[in-house]
Design a protein with these regions (language model features):
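Charge-dense, helix-prone N-terminal extensions
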Residues: 1-122
């Protein structure tokens, strides 16, 4: 496993991924495509909430509870899961951001990204 992830490892993706842009809402950094939030950081920037399929999140949390937690009660209705940045390595954190972005963009953008990043976000 590589070095633990921090917000600076993933912040550039908020502006680099096609149609994505970073915003601050009540002091919290979020990444959006249009009006859809696909990544949101806690105020202290230790937790990264990410778009993730509802039907798969319980299994993800159960498989790696030291890394992933269920979202807050108000976010349970969304395709969302929380990740502890310190428990992730840099590559894993970047892959989670790209996977979250994939959930909110057209498939043609996903295919174009794959062609230009054959080894993933690194």
């Amino acid at each position: 496993m590589g070095l633990m992830a921090g917000i600076e490892d993933v912040r550039p993706l908020g502006a680099e991924l096609e149609r994505s842009y970073p915003v601050y809402v009540r002091g919290r950094l979020k990444f959006r495509v249009g009006q859809i939030v696909y990544v949101a950081f806690s105020l202290d920037e230790t937790v990264m909430g990410i778009a993730f399929p509802k039907e798969a999140r319980a299994a993800l949390v159960a498989s790696e509870p030291h890394k992933f937690q269920m979202p807050s009660a108000s976010d349970m209705r969304f395709n969302w899961v929380d990740a502890d940045l310190a428990a992730l390595d840099r590559i894993e954190a970047r892959e989670l951001v790209v996977d979250a972005w994939r959930m909110v963009v057209p498939k043609k953008l996903c295919r174009a990204y794959d062609l230009t990043h054959p080894n993933g976000p690194g």
